[in-house]
Amino acid sequence: MSNTKQAPKVGFVSLGCPKNLVDSERILTQLRTEGYDVVPSYDDAELVVVNTCGFIDSAVQESLEAIGEALAENGKVIVTGCLGAKENQIREIHPKVLEITGPHAYEEVLGHVHKYVAKPTHNPFTSLVPAHGVKLTPRHYAYLKISEGCNHRCTFCIIPSMRGDLVSRPIGEVLAEAKRLKEAGVKEILVISQDTSAYGVDVKHRTGFYDGMPVKTSMVALCEELAKLDIWVRLHYVYPYPHVDDVIPLMRDGKVLPYLDIPLQHASPRILKLMKRPGTVERTLERIQKWREICPEITLRSTFIVGFPGETEEEFQMLLDFIDKAELDRVGCFKYSPVEGAKANELPDPVPEDVQEERFQRFMELQQQVSIRKLARKVGKEMTVLIDEVDEEGATGRSFADAPEIDGLVYLNGETDLKPGDLVKVRIDEADEYDLWASLIG
């Protein structure tokens, strides 16, 4: 008879954005390091941790439903994440939740787990936890979170109230993590935060150290260092500060991917002012033109809100005109939705839901035509593709122009001998409004 005691099982549910995913990875890594068996289900788990999202109402609802399901299936639930910042709201609906913490409260979550499920005395997983930690993404790409919180006070957003003001991670720590990811076989690093271009602002861009060398705590210096890893580096959530212009030459020179995820939100000066967002249409179009002159290959992704309180038909038309002129490559659009605690809720003249929907459809139809034009220009061109999946029908991957989950795909029909993480040269054969079809070269 074996005396080996089975490791205690902890169920884990991760909801929300990539930034929340990174928080989940950190908690999971520590749980595994301490000897807990983390399982993706409620079966036999001694308790369940739910990492929630609370950014928009639909995310709040999804989080509350996940908590309810975990309570029904297991009974012992610890809640963390963005919705955890609203403890009263959770307890009103789910009073039986054991403990609640806000976002990035790693030590508190672990302390709560220890309280209800004793830390194992023997850890069978010590040698199984990789140096780069537990990852929830495929092995060939990973998110690298460089900061927490945000100093902006956009009226439609409640992130600062949940995650606090900007706190930049030490640059040496960030670069050391990036190196571990590369050594683990990661081919693409996706740099994320609430506000990537503000990296280092809170510490006045002080000089840090990595490998004994001084490195400035700034987005540009970070990009220059990450480039030395010789893997794909993709920038997300880049607030349109003037110094973003300094990253474009690095893209031209192949140091980071020529891809910029830069949320612009609207084109009307009055609506932008109500949102507390920067920029004017003329200046933004000038910058886009300049970026394309410096780096003709650059892919621009952005997000916009239609139906913001007070938005007139004329102001919406300004947004459509901007979309037509800017010819952005990838665009996300959201209908304004009141978020509990957002300042924009107090603004007059809410836009009726049917008008929001009609504007959303017009916006997406126009952007679809822009996307069709842009992708059609890629037919016949050669490019490098990172393979994500392979099945009996062939391989699916992404070019530098496509971030995982949110952008388009490149299909390689019949190519069943490839494997995820392969970087291959292809020629583009066909395109539709979102995706490409290609053939291997050679």
From Swiss-Prot:
Example of a GO biological process term: tRNA modification
Cofactor: [4Fe-4S] cluster
MF (Gene Ontology): 4 iron, 4 sulfur cluster binding; aspartic acid methylthiotransferase activity; metal ion binding; protein methylthiotransferase activity
Organism taxonomic ancestry: Bacteria, Pseudomonadati, Pseudomonadota, Gammaproteobacteria, Aeromonadales
Protein name stated in the entry: Ribosomal protein uS12 methylthiotransferase RimO
Root EC class: transferase
Catalytic activity, EC: 2.8.4.4
Domain TRAM: 376-442
Pfam family, one: TRAM_2
UniProt keyword Iron-sulfur present: yes
Subcellular location: Cytoplasm
Gene Ontology annotations for the cellular component aspect, listed alphabetically: cytosol
Record has Cytoplasm as a keyword: yes
Catalytic activity: L-aspartate(89)-[ribosomal protein uS12]-hydrogen + (sulfur carrier)-SH + AH2 + 2 S-adenosyl-L-methionine = 3-methylsulfanyl-L-aspartate(89)-[ribosomal protein uS12]-hydrogen + (sulfur carrier)-H + 5'-deoxyadenosine + L-methionine + A + S-adenosyl-L-homocysteine + 2 H(+)
Alphabetical list of HAMAP family matching this protein: MTTase_RimO
Superkingdom in the source lineage: Bacteria
Residues at which [4Fe-4S] cluster 2 binds: 150, 154, 157
Protein's job: Catalyzes the methylthiolation of an aspartic acid residue of ribosomal protein uS12.
Family annotation (SUPFAM superfamilies): Radical SAM enzymes (SSF102114)
Binding site for [4Fe-4S] cluster 1: 17, 53, 82
Residue span, Radical SAM core domain: 136-373
Similarity remark: Belongs to the methylthiotransferase family. RimO subfamily.
Cofactor remark from the record: Binds 2 [4Fe-4S] clusters. One cluster is coordinated with 3 cysteines and an exchangeable S-adenosyl-L-methionine.
